[in-house]
């Protein structure tokens, strides 16, 4: 997704366990200046990947998810200020490219209107299932954006608000009470003003 530049020697992500630096072979140019600079002699380019066996009591299988490329009619890939949820997550992250401070991609201004469109690529004839995470993700990100931009109009458009886990309905009510507007319905079309990029 190229949502942030990673250094050749970096920590994989802010919450990595163990919290250690590693060499990203995709970024490293193998100049070996890091070997000379490291006073602890901790860098060894002769190491090769190895398999390590662990005895554990529990295995957690986290399958993750794939990025769905949104439909063209919503302007993704056409309008600069249309991004998807994974990009917003990266932008909002304190260790992301904007260090958690959001601005419009087109002109770096503060956003005044923010709209979340739910169920893009799911709950339709091709993919009738619900992803199970998007509603809560939009509520969380909507609340974060409302904290940073209290004057912004934030709207979440949804088919059904899926808040079916413990505490989710209360979270939904708190989001509504923080002046996030909820509209039940599908968005028909997104257009852009060519001058303002709104």
Q: Residues of each region from the PLM?
A:
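Rossmann-like dinucleotide/flavin-binding elements
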Residues: 1-37, 41-53, 63-165
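A conserved beta-strand/loop element that lines the FAD pocket in flavoprotein oxidoreductases
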Residues: 41-46, 54, 175-188
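Receiver (REC) domain switch/active-site residues of two-component response regulators
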Residues: 57
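Short, polar loop motifs at secondary-structure junctions
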Residues: 65-66, 187-189
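Short, intrinsically disordered, charge-balanced linker/junction segments flanking boundaries
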Residues: 193-198
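Amphipathic alpha-helical
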Residues: 158-179
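Short acidic loop-to-helix transition motifs that present clustered carboxylates
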Residues: 162-164, 188-191
